[in-house]
């Protein structure tokens, strides 16, 4: 159960799904051996009660022979696992989620209530009883049961009991965190008479730290102070004393855009929409102790309206776990929450915002937070700025069920595409291969990529390029840049928006005719898929930290002892997804009804004035660059300033490149918002 990373990652693996118009998993779960009633011991195929069926993706990809650290089997210890329930009609749920979200379909906009979703597609008491009986019969103890969307039977017991229950042996392997981890040596299985009730199983490996009972949350961390000089709008200040690049003096980076500036650039202000009547849910881990006061102070400082009484609410886990710096790092998530809330409120100042704080940053806890929203229909828009490389966990089918149930209810999920490009190991040391991020790669969520945005003096849109930059430091003599611009890659790589082609999902119907086949069949490992696959992102918005947004938060001051409200400039697709989610709230207000899962509607507007078509080279052969200064110690505003040239529009190199070209591309999707809100008026 890996930890999810803020701002760009959260992954899970593949499991069973029926072939759908929207998308399918390419690594489907083993078909149940029985077509009889789960738990009755009856088999529609005539198999005996000892027959078993495999449960896909329960053998971690990293548990290979070459990664084995001991030849001895693991026979002692404790296993805490969740057996997720498949519900009554997984294929029917996926089909309805597609139909209700697709303009022109007879079911478009005919959303179900939470009760209707549960009655049609949720787990049954027969399934709960059958699964519980199987597990307790093997010697495991049931510790919790959830019988809603994302339902499960949680169990605990000895390794020997788990081995009996799931038909595996356990070994010791070098895990993704480079330590010795326990993992099953085979794919787990279930008795044939129960298998149709099982969606997936998690918790059989120990790829992360164990949960602690209830951590006390630490105080906020230090601020990241923006060094001078910087500009309030693009091109305000030119770096006249620094070396030229590409035949010209380059502008200083901006100090951090305000929501007012971004609303102007993306034509939010011109629409007159404010998100009134719409509720946006934001999911992160933990909860900042100063969130509401910080958001209201930030609104005042930037010239916007604070939250009205009751406009911002929180739904928090009863206890928090894994908060330490070497686990989830709770103070870092405070900053994530602050950015997310302030950005959504900045784009949709009249929308209601509900913050759902997960118990930790594990896939399991964040998934529980998402399920809470669907089970209680807390919002019609859900914005999430986290993820991880797609190969790291076994909970992908659980998330897919949650997203599909949400779509059936008219809930749209938005995820950041990532801050490490194509997750090439040279771009992201935490990824062991080039790949996309999950949940952003899911065909049932809107993946939001990143751009570098230039906003003019009058809050006007100047230009945009895909977010991806290479740094070139100032030479020691201050007369030139250390290397010939743009500098060295990957040594100078400074982050970029995520995207690429999924290994896990086939091309959804809404991408057909928009995403070029040559792109959709080009797998990350260089091979060619026989059929088109899901490509992300779907849309994009400002994410470059050097053209980022101002954020205000109570932080530890440079003296190391006091806390005070401070401003900083923040970027990443954590920004872009919240910007777009806020704009989606405005679009929903304009439409007068929930838009639900937005991708079919978004792709319907491809090539229109709803979107800016973002490319790497908006001015042809002219290269784009900025000059940026950083404090040597930005937490304390100390040390000499370090100056860099940042060349823009370089989202990876070689096989890791995500070029932004005319039309759809896997760096910026169909583009960034232009007259998107107005297209619904």
Give residue spans per PLM region.
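Ser/Thr- and Asn-enriched, surface-exposed coil loops between beta-strands
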Residues: 149-151
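Substrate-binding/charge-relay-adjacent region of secreted/lumenal peptidase catalytic domains
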Residues: 47-145, 154, 159-447, 494-571, ...
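An often Trp-containing, charged/polar helix-loop segment at the C-terminal end
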Residues: 588-666
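Compositionally biased, intrinsically disordered low-complexity segments enriched
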Residues: 34-50
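Walker A/P-loop NTP-binding active-site region of P-loop NTPases
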Residues: 583
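Polar, glycine-rich mid-to-C-terminal structural blocks
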Residues: 441-502
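Acidic, glycine-rich loop-and-strand cores that form catalytic or ligand-binding grooves
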Residues: 487-516, 605-632
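Secretory targeting and sorting signals
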Residues: 1-36
């Amino acid at each position: 159960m890996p930890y999810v990373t803020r701002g760009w990652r959260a992954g899970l693996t593949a499991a069973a799904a029926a072939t759908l118009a929207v998308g399918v998993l390419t690594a489907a779960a083993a078909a149940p051996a029985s077509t009889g009633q789960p738990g009755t011991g009856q088999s529609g195929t005539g198999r005996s009660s000892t027959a078993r069926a495999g449960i896909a993706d329960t053998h971690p990809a990293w548990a290979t022979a070459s990664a084995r650290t001991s030849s001895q089997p693991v026979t002692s210890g404790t296993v805490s696992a969740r057996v997720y329930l498949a519900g009554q009609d997984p294929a029917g749920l996926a089909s309805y989620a597609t139909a209700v979200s697709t303009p022109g379909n007879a079911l478009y906009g005919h959303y179900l209530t939470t009760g209707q979703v549960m009655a049609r597609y949720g787990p049954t008491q027969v399934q709960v009883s059958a699964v519980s009986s199987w597990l307790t019969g093997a010697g495991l103890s049931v510790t919790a049961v959830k019988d809603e969307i994302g339902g499960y039977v949680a169990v605990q017991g000895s390794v020997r009991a788990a081995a009996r229950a799931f038909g595996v042996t356990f070994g010791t392997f070098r895990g993704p965190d480079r330590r010795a981890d326990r993992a099953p040596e085979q794919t787990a299985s279930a008795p044939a008479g129960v298998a149709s009730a099982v969606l997936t199983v998690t918790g059989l490996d120990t790829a992360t730290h164990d949960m602690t009972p209830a951590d006390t949350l630490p105080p906020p961390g230090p601020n990241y102070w923006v060094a001078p000089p910087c500009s309030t709008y693009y091109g305000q200040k030119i770096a006249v004393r620094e070396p030229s690049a590409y035949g010209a003096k380059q502008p200083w980076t901006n100090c951090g855009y305000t929501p007012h500036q971004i609303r102007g650039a993306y034509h939010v202000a011109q629409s007159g929409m404010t998100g009134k009547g719409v509720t946006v849910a934001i999911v992160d881990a933990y909860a900042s102790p100063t969130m509401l006061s910080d958001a209201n102070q930030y609104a005042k400082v930037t010239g916007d309206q604070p939250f009205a009484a009751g406009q911002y609410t929180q739904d928090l886990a009863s206890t928090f776990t894994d908060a330490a710096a070497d686990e989830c790092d709770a103070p870092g998530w405070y900053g994530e929450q602050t950015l997310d809330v302030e950005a959504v409120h900045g784009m949709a100042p009249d929308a209601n915002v509900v913050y759902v704080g997960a118990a930790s940053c594990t896939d399991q806890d964040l998934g529980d937070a998402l399920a809470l929203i669907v089970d209680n229909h807390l919002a019609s828009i859900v914005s999430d700025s986290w993820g991880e490389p797609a190969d790291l966990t076994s909970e992908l089918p659980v998330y897919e069920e949650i997203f599909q149930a949400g779509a059936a209810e008219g809930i749209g999920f938005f995820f950041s595409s990532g801050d490490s490009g194509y997750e090439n190991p040279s771009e992201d040391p935490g990824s062991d291969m080039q790949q996309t991020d999950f949940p952003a790669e899911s065909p049932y969520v809107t993946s939001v990529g990143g751009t570098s945005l230039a906003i003019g003096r009058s809050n006007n849109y100047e230009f945009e390029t895909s977010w991806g930059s290479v740094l070139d430091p100032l030479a020691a003599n201050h007369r030139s840049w250390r290397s010939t611009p743009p500098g060295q890659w990957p040594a100078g790589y400074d982050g970029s928006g995520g995207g690429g082609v999924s290994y896990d999902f086939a091309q959804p119907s809404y991408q057909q005719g928009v995403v070029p086949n040559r792109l959709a069949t080009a797998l990350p490992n260089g091979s060619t898929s026989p059929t088109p696959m899901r490509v992300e992102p779907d849309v994009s918005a400002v994410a470059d930290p050097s053209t980022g947004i101002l954020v205000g938060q109570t932080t530890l001051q440079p003296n190391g002892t006091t806390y005070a409200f401070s401003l900083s400039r923040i970027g990443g697709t954590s920004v872009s997804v919240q910007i777009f989610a806020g704009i989606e709230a405005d679009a929903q207000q304009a439409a007068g009804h929930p838009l639900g899962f937005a991708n079919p509607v978004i792709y319907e507007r491809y090539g229109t004035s709803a979107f800016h078509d973002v490319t790497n080279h908006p001015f042809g052969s002219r290269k784009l660059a900025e000059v940026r200064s950083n404090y040597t110690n930005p937490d304390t505003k100390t040390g000499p300033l370090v100056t860099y040239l940042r060349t823009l529009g370089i989202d990876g190199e070689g096989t890791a490149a995500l070029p932004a070209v005319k039309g759809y591309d896997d760096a910026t999707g169909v583009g960034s918002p232009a007259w998107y809100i107005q297209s619904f008026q």
